[in-house]
Amino acid sequence: MNLVSVPISSLSNIKVSANWMSATGNNVDDLNLRLGVQALSDFCVDLNIAIPVGKDSLSMSTTWDSEEHSFEVNSPLSGIITAVANVNDVRQAITTEYQNTAHPLLAYVFPDENLALEKNAIPDISPDAIKSMFDFLQENIRNKSILALHDVSDGGLLCCLSELCFTNKIGITWEVANNSSTDEIFTLEEQLKLFPFAETIGAVIQIDAKNYDLLRSSAKQMDISMCQVGKPVGKRISIKTKNNNVILDKCITDLERAWSQTSYHIKAMRDN
């Protein structure tokens, strides 16, 4: 999803580098590496994406002794995936920076199959859902219906909205209402618990409000859900229900300061 804001002619033009890190040398870690590589390979074959290069770091363990004990630390299996693609015209690319429009609106788009992840279900995503999301977003970037975009990843929807606020130094006001895409499966209360922090595939896009109905209709035909998540305005993130019950109301400066704390403390320890 990190590449989707740049116009790419097709998914098959994307090339992937895979860097696997593991503490191999035992049956468990060797098997996990084999299963991980196979899963990535199968997924990329379904997407028609090649993995021409990669790198392996398979000695990710260390041991040391003290006077009384021996210690061993093993790295868990991880795959670092880097994707690149040729771009015909970089001037068509969009970013997280809002564009001037008469009636700015933010919308959350995600595959319909996300709605099947009830309660504690293990997240998964099908190649068909990736293709649909890619095609929908790319088409509407090219025709300039999508003006800005940020993918939903670590931290879920709420972090995505917060990062948009930090980038643009503009807040968001969002009145949460029952959404026809979700209210058949989740109550409003469950939506508020699940969706703000769900780290499932999706994106928040800036559009002009006059195009919302047309875009939502187009998304529905591609098995993609789309719902409004507020308007960029002011200097606060203000999320309320239709009954004016406050869910979140924070100054974006305070949120950005809290958001930066982890990086600040890591840097302070590392650079000391």
Q: Where would I find each of the regions flagged by the language model?
A:
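A general structural motif
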Residues: T82-N88, I125-F134, V176-L188
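Short amphipathic alpha-helical segments, especially helix-boundary/capping motifs
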Residues: K15-S17, D135-E139, E189-K193
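Glycine-/charge-enriched secondary-structure boundary and capping motifs
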Residues: D29-G79, R142-N272
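Glycine-rich phosphate/pyrophosphate-binding loop regions near the starts of catalytic domains
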Residues: M1-D124, P196
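A glycine- and small/hydrophobic-rich beta-loop-beta segment
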Residues: Y108-D112, K119-L149
